[in-house]
Amino acid sequence: MFHAASAQKYVDASTLTIIGRTCPMEGHPYYRVDTTRYRFDNATIRHYCGYPAGVAVLFTTDSRRIEARWTTAPRSYGWNMTPVLQRGMDLYVRENGVWTMAGAARPGLQDRHASTIVEHMDGQPKECMLYLPAWSELLTLEIGVDEGASVTPLESPYKHRVIVFGSSVTHGASASRPGMTYPARMSRMTGIEFVNLGYSGNCMLQPEFARLLAETDADAFLFDAFSNPSPKMIRERLDAFVATLVKAHPDKPLIFMQTHWHTAGNLDQEAAKFHRERINTADGMMRRLAKQYDNVYFLDGEWFFGRDAEGTIDCDHGSDLGYDRMISERLPRIRKILRLSLIHISEPTRRTPI
């Protein structure tokens, strides 16, 4: 059921600034990738192109309250993710240069949603960033404000961008809300736009993805590329995948991250055998490729969610705690590589990771 909200004026969010898209699609403002240009045979991948994981709307308003009403394509809720992550949104406001969470847009049980995000503000202009649903196709989005308030596009604060290609870990499972995925958090922490190109369960070093990434302009590329493919797939596809990207981006950092240890393998012997073979296969091949190509880097280490299972929601996908651990372990190493490319990185303040 669609619940009426109390805001007196609504603005079509597609008329505001939209960031986080790899290849925008005409007529579908919230798609991450244009599916008419990149035609994937896999229907799930095509659907995921339309999921706005990591996409955000930027605007400035002096309204005392901010609301939203939006529609999503029909889809069942996943059991290991929050409704807010899947169909909801979260709003950040920039104060004194720091992005601070202001509220969340609560989704309904059906496909039409309306929610008050924040109210009783002081009426002074606020710079806002609204993260969109990570696990649903967003069909329409309107932002509600007071009748006499202004809503204007806000210029992107990011001057550099890094494409992050990966699995469900990159897509966002199972952060508590869209703004808590690790690419979104690292963007706020560094002042660099980490663009989310996560494809849950379907990041398997396919040639189609190599073509998409080869034709995408960015300052650097970060890969969570080993969580989905089998050891056999890695052996068969990795060399060609890397060669395609090196040829297309010979001067851009190509940073590959080791996959995480799946803690189900702590007790499940079959799982342990499979995951250990995959980790060892990726490790051996990436060390060779990092020596072969000057712009290829490998971040080893599979324990970034922690050696316990407390950093996951299901022994596989990260929780907010797990992603906090991951960022603490990975980001200093990523910063070092990006600085070698003379990319300016902001130093985080105490509140930025929130």
What are these regions (language model features)?
Residues 235, 320-331:
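Short, amphipathic alpha-helical "lid/cap" segments that border enzyme active or binding sites
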